[in-house]
Design a protein with these regions (language model features):
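Pepsin/retropepsin-fold aspartyl endopeptidases
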Residues: 1-126
Length: 126
């Protein structure tokens, strides 16, 4: 699977097209564009999408921003589809402030990815 970088950011941002699903059920929501963020520990999904899935609640957590600020958040479990792959039971944080999906290392470390900056494409090597 190949996806072109999003040029709405400068410099262009690596992104992937994903689907979301209730754990162990079909990937029913999507496709959505998700930011590939290799510096993020975890994956963040807008709370509205999590509520539409009625995703199972896992725990209340605290997150630290890149500026060192702490925020309270809620963690849920969802399945995430990338290309023909289904990544089951991924713990994600529900974001009440943004409509962006951020794929962190808890997802990215399960994929074989090529970030081809000169060509401005993200490739999932299956």
């Amino acid at each position: 699977m190949i996806h072109h970088y999003a040029k709405t950011w400068y410099p262009p941002m690596p992104v992937l097209e994903i689907w979301l699903g209730y754990p162990e059920e079909s990937l029913s929501l999507g496709p959505y564009i998700a930011i590939v963020d290799t510096a993020a520990d975890g994956t963040i999904i807008p709370i509205g999408l999590i509520e539409r899935l009625e995703a199972p609640f896992v725990d209340d957590v605290r997150l630290r921003s890149q500026w060192g600020e702490w925020h309270r958040a809620r963690m849920f479990t969802v399945d995430i589809g990338v290309g023909s792959l289904c990544l089951p039971a991924i713990e994600v944080v529900g974001d009440e402030r943004s409509d962006e999906i951020i794929l962190g290392r808890n997802v990215l470390n399960r994929l074989r990815l090529l970030l081809d900056g000169p060509a401005s494409v993200t490739k999932v090597l299956e």
